[in-house]
């Protein structure tokens, strides 16, 4: 029985926390999708962004699981490499180019926001992002 309990706990231990993201801040980045992964436990995508120094950097954006994203209108085909987007993220605390997805605006003006813990700001276990007035531009 003890071995069964240990096995049941392993998936929980394998899942990381969101502590690497600064959920008190948001950053808006604009660029071109270079990769989209529709996978469990987290979907993700990468965006090529031109930074303030005029150099291209790739932002790695972590999202929620596909089943949660589908509740807010996402499909496996919502974004693809080459798409121009604007993305609101909670940035990585270490300052590297990346973050936790909050919302995306597609080239046609369609806006999708996140769902699930830490994504729609309705889960008290995850602090809400800063107000839109406190949103900072990408580096």
Language model: regions and residue ranges:
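Boundary at the C-terminal end of the N-terminal hydrophobic targeting segment
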Residues: 12-16
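PEST-like low-complexity, intrinsically disordered acidic/proline/serine-rich tracts
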Residues: 19-139
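Sec-dependent signal peptide recognition
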Residues: 1-3
